[in-house]
């Protein structure tokens, strides 16, 4: 009897092992993987389809359905409407520096772009392959994805220190899983994904070619929007400081795509400091429009003869994590701002958020250009600054512990 029991256990183990081998031998395409990670049903014939019966995935799907529905109502739909109203002639390319893997807001502000260039320090990571996860690995993977997105779903930005930890955990790591989720939840269909690197001339190479030390690495994703038109997303992991840009071909890669529309938000005020002047000057020279909050390019860096300024919302100064970044000229400019019905940036509440739309003036219009609201020279006496509160936590609707 004991011998029969041992044989039965051995047979069951072999069956389970065979199933695991069969599962890992299958490969899911990028679009199905993105939908699975986003809590959306993959195609019926996908090898990922059976995994959606896992209670962990079903809970994950319910959580993301709720979280993204709230985000769509609270912010994204309003940003899309704002953009369509105020960006009259969008360029084919949009640039989003210091973005992290934030395709979500790149798409909301610039849904009509055909090429997206996102750049930040965070590594791309390998192409996600859920089928290679060990048995029992689905739950931890989905927790990792949710935890990685917690701050941007709440505040509209990634918390850099937290992201460094989140993106280096688990079998599926890096920024690609997050880009996948945002593409799927934005209604996009992924057609192809490849890992790339850039040489010092800005030429794109496949990742399987020999990579020089410190070369910018990233990914190229082709996808279709709801209109069926093919679009391209580049995410490049690179150092955007002066020294980093001077030693890489990243800006040479960007130059043929310019001029474009630029987005800067929650950028840690890096463009205010001397070690990021190369990036700042490049954006000013190669952007047709710039949408930013006050953490982007300081107002004093704009040439008032070349730009028109359209302020929206309310400027209350930086949060207390960034002392010394208050701008008197910005405050004067926003005294004549238009209403803003969505929150963005470090002051994520709509009643405290600011958005500045800067539009480059055509050469023929220079000299007779009149700004909607001109920055005032720093002659008035210094006004008292508003209180700079700590960043407060938003409503908690995440199921995972904090």
What are these regions (language model features)?
Residues 25-151, 222-225, 231-402:
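Non-globular targeting/processing and membrane-anchoring segments
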Residues 99-111, 117-120, 155-180:
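Short, thiol/selenol-centered motifs that function as redox-active sites or metal-ligating centers
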């Amino acid at each position: 009897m004991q011998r029969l029991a041992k044989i039965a256990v051995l047979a069951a183990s072999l069956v389970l092992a065979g199933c695991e081998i069969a599962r890992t031998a299958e490969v899911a395409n990028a679009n199905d993987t993105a939908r699975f990670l986003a809590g959306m049903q993959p195609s019926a014939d996908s090898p990922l389809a059976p995994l959606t019966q896992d209670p962990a995935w079903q809970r994950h799907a319910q959580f993301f359905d709720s979280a993204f529905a709230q985000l769509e109502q609270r912010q994204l739909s309003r940003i899309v409407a704002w953009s369509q109203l105020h960006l009259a002639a969008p360029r084919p390319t949009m640039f989003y520096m210091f973005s992290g893997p934030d395709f979500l807001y790149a798409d909301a502000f610039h849904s009509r772009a055909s090429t997206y260039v996102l750049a930040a320090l965070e590594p791309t990571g390998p192409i996600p392959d859920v089928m290679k996860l060990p048995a029992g690995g689905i739950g931890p993977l989905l927790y990792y994805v949710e935890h990685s997105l917690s701050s941007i779903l709440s505040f509209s930005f990634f918390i850099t220190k937290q992201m460094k930890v989140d993106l280096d955990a688990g079998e599926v790591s890096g920024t690609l899983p997050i880009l996948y989720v945002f593409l799927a939840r934005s209604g996009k269909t992924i057609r192809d994904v490849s890992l790339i690197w850039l040489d010092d001339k800005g030429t794109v190479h496949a990742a399987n070619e020999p990579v020089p030390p410190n070369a910018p690495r990233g990914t190229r994703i082709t996808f279709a929007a709801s209109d069926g038109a093919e679009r391209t997303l580049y995410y490049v992991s690179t150092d955007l400081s002066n020294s980093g840009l001077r030693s890489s071909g990243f800006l040479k890669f960007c130059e043929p795509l310019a001029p474009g529309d630029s987005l800067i938000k929650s950028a840690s005020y890096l463009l205010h400091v001397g070690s990021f002047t190369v990036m700042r000057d490049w954006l000013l020279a190669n952007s047709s429009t710039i949408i930013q909050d006050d953490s982007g390019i300081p107002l004093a860096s704009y040439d008032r003869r070349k730009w028109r300024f359209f302020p929206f919302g309310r400027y209350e100064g930086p949060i207390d994590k960034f002392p010394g970044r208050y701008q008197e000229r910005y405050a004067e400019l926003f005294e004549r701002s238009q209403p803003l019905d969505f929150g963005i940036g470090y002051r994520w509440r709509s009643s405290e958020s600011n958005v500045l739309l800067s539009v480059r003036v055509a050469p023929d219009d220079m000299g007779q250009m009149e700004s909607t609201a001109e920055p005032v020279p720093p002659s008035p006496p210094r006004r008292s600054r508003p209180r700079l509160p700590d960043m407060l936590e938003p409503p908690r609707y995440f199921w995972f512990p904090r």
